[in-house]
Amino acid sequence: MDSKDQTMFYNFGDDSIEEDVKKLMKQVYVALEEKGYNPVNQIVGYLLSGDPAYIPRHKDARSLIRRLERDEIIEELVKAYLKNNEIGEK
């Protein structure tokens, strides 16, 4: 069997970043709203591209969002979505 056909496991290991991500996302969201941007569109643009230009410097939002790896933010967003929609672990 080709190794590309096998499922790979991805484990971040540390679940303690949930509160860090939550606090950071709130701050970035507020900064984006205050500047008149659509926060969801801008955050998605940053997470997909890695380009910090999607996040303004207002209220130090650009520096804040770069403190965490994008994959850590995405992991927490997916976990929150699944939990809020009662999908997966109870």
Swiss-Prot record:
Belongs to the UPF0297 family. This is UPF0297 protein lwe1516. It comes from the Bacteria. NCBIfam families: PRK05473.1. InterPro entries: IreB. It comes from Listeria welshimeri serovar 6b (strain ATCC 35897 / DSM 20650 / CCUG 15529 / CIP 8149 / NCTC 11857 / SLCC 5334 / V8).
